């Protein structure tokens, strides 16, 4: 049921975008400079004629479905009194670095610092290797109780974590419970120090 609802929401969003594209495609011209240069992010829904209210509602609905509804993929837990959270792979009922990093990306974009911090804490506590040749990297696959199912790392997860942490540093600064910039730098250092044999 959970998988069905998630797929239904995603398909609905694609249908909505897909049905609007043919009639409005002429209005959408490529930008000469990207957001990194201009500081402006392109809003395709706005360009397609949707009102700010409609766009905000669609985003809020999607966030609610994934993070707060009865069929959510995000779960909050406490481990030794520390608030943590994880994003469950809906099909396999497990946790992967990909899902964790995607959850953090959504949280930083939606300005949900507590959710972001919970996911990062869970990832560091359960997924990050504390010793051995993969020290500092993350097991890509865990059970929802935190037990690692695969010790190897998947570099996409680490790179997405770095991106999320850099965005969090920019949005929230580094003076709170988590120094996002330092975490990103530490992870980058761990990534660059590996020779590929671990």
Language-model regions, residue ranges each:
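Extended ligand-binding groove/face enriched in aromatic
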Residues: 69, 125-198
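Solenoid-repeat scaffolds in large eukaryotic assemblies
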Residues: 103, 115-116, 177, 184
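Aromatic- and histidine-enriched alpha-helix N-cap/loop-to-helix transition segments
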Residues: 91-102, 111, 152-163
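Bacterial N-terminal signal peptides that target proteins for export
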Residues: 1-10
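Hydrophobic core
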Residues: 15-19
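Active-site cradle of extracellular carbohydrate-active enzymes
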Residues: 107, 120, 195-198
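Low-complexity, Ser/Thr/Pro/Gly-enriched N-terminal "stalk/linker" regions
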Residues: 22-98, 109-143
